[in-house]
A protein has these predicted regions:
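Conserved ATP/PPi-binding loop(s) of AMP-dependent carboxylate-activating enzymes
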Residues: 198-202, 213-248
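Single conserved hydrophobic/aromatic residue that forms the stacking wall/gate
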Residues: 1-8, 12-14, 251-262
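Gly/Ser/Thr-rich phosphate-binding loop
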Residues: 82, 110-114, 123-190, 204, ...
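Conserved AMP-binding/adenylation subdomain of ANL enzymes
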Residues: 39-57, 67-111, 124-126, 130
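Conserved AMP-binding A3 loop
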Residues: 16-40
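Structural core segment of the AMP-binding/adenylate-forming
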Residues: 6-9, 108, 115-116
Length: 262
């Protein structure tokens, strides 16, 4: 029997969880997520980025130990009134490459999120999409991929065999929710293979050269986000606030603007 306890009010700035990430260099960082900002960001993301409504069925395919699991298996869908599918297993050989499609059909999934690696593995086992045709995917509206580069070939293959829109988008543990995404719940932007779409409302994304000068289109540089950061982004590192502050750079572009290098 479950014991029912009185709910306890929390301040919006109270810590919700701490998640360690190694990043690409340096020692691991304890990302601190706050209650209020996380709730605001994820409710916005579920509705406006992923196009989900209360009563919809969402499937975030990840491990709860990663930020995708926290944001898009637990907090985001449940706060938005969605059913969330929790799945443990490989995309192939359980027993075959139709495992994902079987779950979509069985639970009437409306949208799913996974890493490109999973779809590349499915493609390798079922290049012509023969197994996918054995399942009813009429409930599925969108597929979202992130976590690594989604190559154009896999993007185009997945759209062809599934008959559904495929969207690449980008974010990371420090932000807790998407930085660039299609925003299908708003007007959205057409899926473009090789693109992770435009900046989500609230993020002011810039690309700078090594000297901190603003770059235009079709140039490679460092991606930065102008302050203030939107709700949901980490505001400190556990036990190492000085290190967090060191990552906040004062860079002058057309006018003095504080930027967060990511």
């Amino acid at each position: 029997h479950l014991s029912i306890r009185r709910q306890r009010q929390m301040c919006i700035r109270d810590r919700l969880y701490i998640m360690y990430t190694s990043g690409t260099t340096g020692k691991p960082k304890g990302i601190v997520r706050e209650n209020g900002g996380n709730a605001v960001a994820l409710c916005y993301a579920m509705r406006h980025i992923y196009g989900m409504q209360a009563g919809d069925v969402w499937w975030g395919i990840s491990d709860v130990g990663w930020v995708v699991g926290h944001s898009l298996i637990v907090y985001g869908p449940l706060m938005s009134g969605c059913t969330t599918v929790f799945y443990e297993g490989k995309p192939i050989r359980t027993p075959d490459a139709s495992a994902y499609w079987r779950v979509v059909e069985q639970y009437q999934v409306n949208a799913l999120f996974c890493a490109p690696t999973a779809m590349r593995a499915i493609r390798k086992e079922d290049p012509e999409g023969e197994l996918i045709r054995n399942h009813d995917l009429s409930s599925l509206r969108q597929l979202f991929l992130a976590g690594e580069k989604l190559d154009s070939s896999t993007h185009e293959w997945l759209e062809r065999v599934s008959g559904k829109p495929v969207h690449d988008h980008w974010w990371q543990t420090e932000t807790g929710w998407p930085v660039t995404a299609p925003c299908v719940g708003l007007e959205g932007s057409a899926a473009k293979p090789g693109s992770s779409n435009r900046a989500v409302p609230g993020y002011h994304v810039r690309v700078l050269d090594d000297e901190g000068h603003l770059l235009g289109a079709n140039h490679q540089g460092s991606i930065v986000i102008a302050l203030p950061l939107p709700p949901g982004c980490s505001q400190t590192l556990w036990g190492d606030h000085e290190r967090y502050l060191q990552a906040l750079s004062l860079i002058h572009i057309s006018e003095p603007t504080r930027l967060r290098r990511i």
